[in-house]
Swiss-Prot record:
Lineage, opening ranks: Eukaryota, Fungi, Dikarya, Ascomycota, Pezizomycotina
GO biological process, one term: polysaccharide catabolic process
GO molecular function: exo-1,4-beta-D-glucosaminidase activity; hydrolase activity, hydrolyzing O-glycosyl compounds
Signal peptide: 1-18
The name this protein goes by in its record: Exo-beta-D-glucosaminidase
Chemical reaction(s) catalysed: Hydrolysis of chitosan or chitosan oligosaccharides to remove successive D-glucosamine residues from the non-reducing termini
Amino acid sequence: MIAKAVAALLLGSGLASAAGTPLTSKAGDKVPIPDWDLKSSSEVSKDLKGLSKPGVDTSAWYHAGTSKCTLMACLLNAGIYKDEDLWYSDNLNHFNWGQFSIPWLYRHEFALAPAKGKHFILQTNGITSKADLFFNGQQIADSEYQAGAYAGRTYDITSLAAKDNAFVVQVHPTDYLYDFALGYVDWNPYPPDNGTGIWRDITVKETGSVSMGPISVVVDIDVPVESSPAKVTIRAEAQNLENVAVVLDAEAVVSGNSCSGGPLKQTVKLAPGEKKLVEFTKTIAKPKIWWPKQWGDQPLYNAKVTFSVNKAVSDTAQTNFGVRKVTSFVNQYNDTQYSVNGHPFQVVGGGYGADMFLRWDGDRFTRIVEYMLDMHQNTIRLEGKMEHPELYEICDKYGLMVMPGWECCDKWEAWAYNDELAIFPPPVWDDNDYQTANYSMIHEASMLQPHPSVLTFLVGSDFWPNDEAVVLYVNALKNAGWQTPIIASASKRGFPALLGPGGMKMDGPYDWVPPNYWYDTEPSEDRLGAAFGFGSELGAGVGTPELGSLKRFLSQSDLNDLWKNPNKNLYHMSTNVSSFYNRKIYNQGLFKRYGAPTSLDDYLLKAQMMDYEATRAQYEGFSSLWTASRPATGNIYWMLNNAWPSLHWNQFGYYMHPAGSYFGTKVGSRIEHVAYNYQKKEVWVINHSLDQTGPRKVDIELIDTNGKQIAKQSVNINTKANSGFKAADISSQIGKLSSVAFLRLILSDSKGNVLSRNVYWVTNSIDKLDWDSSTWYYTQVTSFVDYTPLNKLSAAQISVTTGSSRRVAGVPGTQTRTVTLENKPSVPAVFIRLTLVDKSGNDVNPVSWTDNYVTLWPKEKLQLEVGGWDASGDSIQVSGRNIAATTVKL
């Protein structure tokens, strides 16, 4: 094993320099290598030491103008391939995968300014999944040492550094079953390169005699946090890089939110090569508390640490942090329940999908966070896709909690007791694997620790780590100052004694189930994913894109297959060996419940109704039963988004278009809400807030498909913060229905302000589930409800008027318009779909609607708002179940 490593992990900040200008300019600078030349090893010299000397001609190599990219991402960046070509139809299935079956080389030349007393540290943060490193003609690491996609390593290159420098990284082909990588399991087809390459920045850091490790910030505060002081401990490891003793002057400054007091100082003596943890403690008497978005503000403090030797800066770094407290416990039902700042916290979220080629786009992720908050989600789960520091900075800023953790179904869970891998017996870990896993956890813990948005860490997903691995994981986390719950796994298959039960269930579903599934909770031992306990990944598998997106990645033949061949395997689903390679289960429900589609447009509108009712019911079920006798403590929808354009498993499409699954989620997760329990035919009131209490009114009305009133009542209640409770039993009214009817629920406050408006299409029966025949991914329906009368609705006529454009503060370029819908006839206008388009008729994405896919009562008027992140919106396309499609100019 070859390595010239510095034990400390170094973090900091800096800006890349132009060619010929030294990459770093002063102590404390930490600069990513800005771009790469790359080439297959079959096309270059085998003399890698020679290739790592300055002056090599790389004019025939590919050039990627980005600091980080897997092989595929680099080639896309270089213009060799295009997304629209790769994504179209099944083109990816015909790609030349073989070119990545051998090593590839990354190369970059850069300048430095070596001088006495200067040190240069090269740090890897993420290479998938193993590599040989060469610098200025010398090998500094082999692929046994530089192994693991998350195993950040540091290398002291001071003795090799020169004015002109060359660096070569030889990456080896990744095998998910044998390497610690970033796999996709059955989420989507595997990328042709299996994610091989430099997917995170490789940085060069300049220091003086003493280098600084990552800063951690330990915050101790009692509840109630609102009236308690916070003890803040700032920690960073100092390492003497000299062969003589040095005296270190260390200083820390805490700032932000009117934080008072001067610098914290201390002097530290370091023997040659010695490492020592330097700690500073400060008490903030009246701290500003960081809250999840739905509960409050997100004030951030800053901690800056500076190491000086002989009155000259040797190293410096800073990090933001927040004052908050996260705990968890496993209740009497073996379910995990979180608490944030002393308040029970129901996890409401989705499972994140990284880009198939691991390309990071901070602006795109910001839009994703804004979408999640618009859907009233509070948590995002990252299964093995921990991305980059910027992700957590964005979540800190916006108030979205994060559940990072290791992934399932590959080398990360190659335990002797794991009988579910694609290979048997499992390729169990050897000594080097444990070392790789240890360095992976050390690196990720140091990156994650200061961020207040981090809710927890899952050291296992489908299976729990063995005793040897869990000790490494827990020690690495604790040594980093970890303060949030460490969870053994996202399932209840087992657990290590050191951590105890994980308290999360992974019992499905992953494919379509009807809305009443979530409310059918008894007996709970047989009800799998229904709304009780903590569901770490579950959902009805929905997420059908609308036509504007579908045309971007499907051929006409593919589009025809959607509705003409309902059982056909489809490339834009999961992998071809998974249980999710077709829409058979989903389409059975659609055809049986809504009737066979008569066209692609008819299929897509029915699909949006299916998707809308599916996600709405899931979130309403968990929210309603949050304070039940066996509480529904958490719910992660599988999945939030996709790695590529997909036909299922998302709350919004790859092209950022929000459709039925999005608005079903948004309605079902409202902070104050009123919902229909399909199983018991009851009306429930939901309150996710901490402070919104007092009198409320629930208006309940049933009408038939012709608009005739069947029943109407109002219920006055007092809402309870952070709870769900029954407001009314309407089983007698529902039981008398002879056909499909529409149920409208309106929740209002004491001033008459509408807090939630919610419309269902219902019958006197529900879909019948055969729980005894359940599989790991769905529960069979033996009898379906009949919504086919919706195909014979009388035509409604609506008017659509738009208000003047206005700017939204804090969002540059955003345009917002009011859109008023009025249903003039005496029949309901059902499932009205509104799509913002540009002058060419293409979808404007991302886009924000206060509501969409709405159903209007006869003579009802409803005002909505639409906002886009640019000014390209030109008109609104309007369609629905029983209205004529039209386009309204803005």
